[in-house]
């Protein structure tokens, strides 16, 4: 047998997991190719073995667990839950992250190199800038496709609840709410029924208000066999879902098999949901566990109550408990009803008073059955649950789903009483048309065939019945009869039906809501007695076979049936047949073997039916006799007299009952019970149908209301829901039709009851849809009214108030009052805008949306204008205050020295600067206020006037600068005479008495402190008081020390700093020219301002939306486009959230910019990723056809999206280089940070190309993404033994990879994998030969010894590689040492080495290292965890030299002794004793030749290069 090709294996696996494969193939194969190409390097076999086969087992387990709770159903989508026809639910590859919105997620099988593929949930991270992957644990497969699982995920999320699942399809990505996805659909196929099991099935657990208990379920529902599963499985009823009337399949006429399967065709079912009072996560999967059995058959063969209506519990096994052996185990695992808080009132009472649908005319267990009586059945409807109805199996639009969500509950309104389960689903029995007729008949044998016979005429006294009923009145929940329904919306609550609580031995006196009367025409007692039996078989000609067995002699008080009664019964039996069988007529078999007396009216009735009708009802009359026929038959015409042995000429044994020698075991009593209920069901259906049609006509004829109306349930629908007949029909209809299938004549009967029932179902569904449409129209009108009200308010009062803020006022007090009013107005507007936008969320009214946006923009403009006017008025107020205060000081100072000091104080006061005036003038021009411009001119004139007065007072024109300098020099000499610690006297004693009080300086003004020239003046004018003069000068509220100069660059006065700018105490150092410093600071601030402005523009550009690639691009280019946009989105988040704020924080300290860049070095590595993706896009776009390429270039966003990040990177580098030139030589740390930042930015382009080269490696089975960061990539000439070749070498943190340049694919280079080594096994010899370009890498842990000599293209490349490898090996050695110490401590050994007591000469090996050889290699050959001793730090190159004659074999030394020798070597190679415990390893400097230690930290010794044997094993490159 030939092995299956890989392609066929992949397709067969996908076809098994995702049926139908012809619909899912386009989506799945595209995902397969994507994963094969990206993850498995186009290796289909490895993909199949490592990914697809494990994924198949994982997905099969998920599917099995999800479908286990619906055992017995026929799924509408056969691939659920993995796919819904062409829509794939569980993805095999990642979806484009741009399609994810808040609340969206999707499931994916994620490949992994280290382990088997796993299932993961992918969604947007809380920040929104990246995709978050949440692994799904294997134990979650049992409840993955449940609402509870997603609720558990949402509990762990801080923000943003997940609710919508993404499905991939050939047409694109689809969105489906999780609540709908976890609810599978079930549909009919080939006219067969679907549902749970062919029995009375468990009701749903209502999801009522909190605190209401859940009712236990009857155990009889467990005894059914699911089709195809091979074992009995419990059926699960939906929990709190929308329930409708079960619909019935119409059989194909003329087909006995199809007629036999007449029943439900559309069972709309929503799976179970967790009830409000649930006790656990899996409560929805255990809706059937807490159940009470109804008992088994009595020993005398009587059927227990409920068994007459349950086919599942009795068709395959003697009792419901035996039919499902797991039922008792499941029941034992559930707590009792009392422990769960379930009150006895929530359960119904089994017995005569309140029997469930599963009960017929029988009494409680242990009570003999009373036949021929129908009065006790009238009370049975009181104990049946209520159901709900609505919806349709066909899918609705999303709009309909949303609007129908409120109406789902309409048909299942809860009543204010206790809960009662009220739903019974139906199961579809799939029958194979190719089976033998006998096999199909055997499958449909009713429960009565295996029931032992019991005398039907036995009837106990009435007292005995009551006594047994009193004993058996126990709380019992009964199954309802309505079926679940598929409806693609949210689940609704389950109806609660009022139940009777029977206390003591009294029965409820209340009548049921519907009085179900017996049919006054059909004699059901006659049917139940076995007088007329429609056997369900046919004769040799295909006519339906009906047997007549006259009863024994009647009691005197009982009268014989009349001719009309007999004729009516026969006509009723004939009417039950299918239309084709009605045309053929009946074959009557009159059994007179026991020679009973014939009822007088029997023969006239038969004769009448033989002659009447066209065609006649009775086509053939066969009389079975034992001896001579009775005298009454002598004159009867058209009868055939046969003996028992001649019956085979009439019908086959399979068509006859067992007392006639056939194989059929019939139960006339059971048949009569079922058909009596069917007759009452038809009466109910007709009444409900009339009521529903009237409601439909009323809804269709209702005109739209002119005034405002409340959104709610329409009144016609409320009337229908309040009709008790609908409740009774929902409660019993489905179960009755289900029981009808268990009758022995069901395959011959027509679809009349099912058609009528389905007609009611469709009418109710039409009513619900009309009601939903009405509610939708009401909500649309309500939303339209809300929008209109908001628009009217905006155009009326809102517009008036907004216009009032256009001219806010010309005074500060008025503006402040206006600001308060504007805040209240803005809050009101925002509330109305939010209300209108919520109403427009489901509409596409662009005009109204535009009106709202325009008004909001005008509101923002008004707010901006108001704030600018406030700022302008505050400036005017401060300027006037400064002028008034200065004028008052000058006026109050008088003349002389006091006036001079006041002028000096005002000269240093924080006057408004010229720049501030220009800024305020620009504000006034923007506001367009002439009054503001006039006020600005007035303020400027007053300030200039005050400045002129100050200049006049000081007399600067007559006072030369040299005079002030001479006074400054004299002040310096006078200060020296006072002593070094003598403080300068203060001017506060002169300024404070004449000053009205200190004032705080505005932040935008500057303060120029007093210089030394005026300090001397202060010395002369202010003698010391009490020997302790004040140490500071208090000027306008600011304290400045007398020995400190505070410089503000915005101060217009410069002469103050001239006296001390060049001294050693100056703030800028010794001998730096002041103007040069100012120029440098100004340039630095200019560069930082330009950098911040550039960053703001860049953030704005990144926030612009970027369109998705068009369909003309290849799938690979679209994926690369998506990856580039993903990196761009992460850059947007980083720059907008973090980096811009940090740059703004560096505005006052320009030279800190370099540290800011270095602090976010990891984030700037994203630019390398962007460079990689951009180069791939450029090469891919260059390979496109000219037409496609031209269409791409026409897109305006493509060039900016591709070029903007790299242009910004170059702009960063230029600004940092200029800032580095402006930094003084004395700022060494800042210059180093700036230089490192420039280098970081320049490396990104090269790192991006390196990453692109890593992806271009072909044939490598190692996942290079898991080998750490790529450190270097360069071409080398590699020498291995006698072989010399050119290789491109990649150095990762954990791997060294050799590759060969192959060529270009689509404009990019590709490399072929040759060899790879773990860096943990690597040793380094830094110098080989005399060229200065070679170094050696060797590996001890692999074979005997492998060594590779690498010749670089330049000394710089060689130094770069050796330095990086040395640092890498040092880090590994230090890390391994720490791990080894931890292991020793955990073993109780400790971290101090054990020292043998030996002679010093034996322990000292360093003396051997003092030889002077020309050159040798110092490298490392010890692997991880081999030795525990600490390493020797600080070794110099000379200390590691060995004599040339020493061979490597001579150094087979005890490594532990080497590590225990606690000695250090000085730089000259001499031995010096060291500490007992050496310090930790320190990496060498990049330029040094210190040997690099690999894992273990033990110094290994190697011989010279020329002494290596040529026979050493090597690995070909």
From Swiss-Prot:
The modification Phosphothreonine is found at residues 367, 1490. Residues 1263-1370 form the PH domain. InterPro entries: DBL_dom_sf, DH_dom, PH-like_dom_sf, PH_domain, Rho_GEF_signaling-related, SOS1_NGEF_PH. GO terms for cellular component: cytosol; plasma membrane. The modification Phosphoserine is found at residues 262, 415, 929, 959, 1080, 1431, 1436, 1472. Residues 306-320, 332-345, 970-994 have a biased composition (Low complexity). GO terms for molecular function: guanyl-nucleotide exchange factor activity. Residues 194-238, 254-514, 952-1011, 1464-1517 are annotated as: Disordered. Residues 1083-1251 form the DH domain. Residues 353-363, 384-393 have a biased composition (Gly residues). Residues 370-382 have a biased composition (Basic residues). It is found in: Cytoplasm. Ubiquitously expressed but enriched in brain. In brain, it is expressed at higher level in olfactory bulb and cerebellum and peaks perinatally (from 16 dpc to P0.5). May act as a guanine nucleotide exchange factor (GEF). This is Rho guanine nucleotide exchange factor 40. It comes from Mus musculus (Mouse). The lineage of its organism: Eukaryota, Metazoa, Chordata, Craniata, Vertebrata. The gene is Arhgef40.
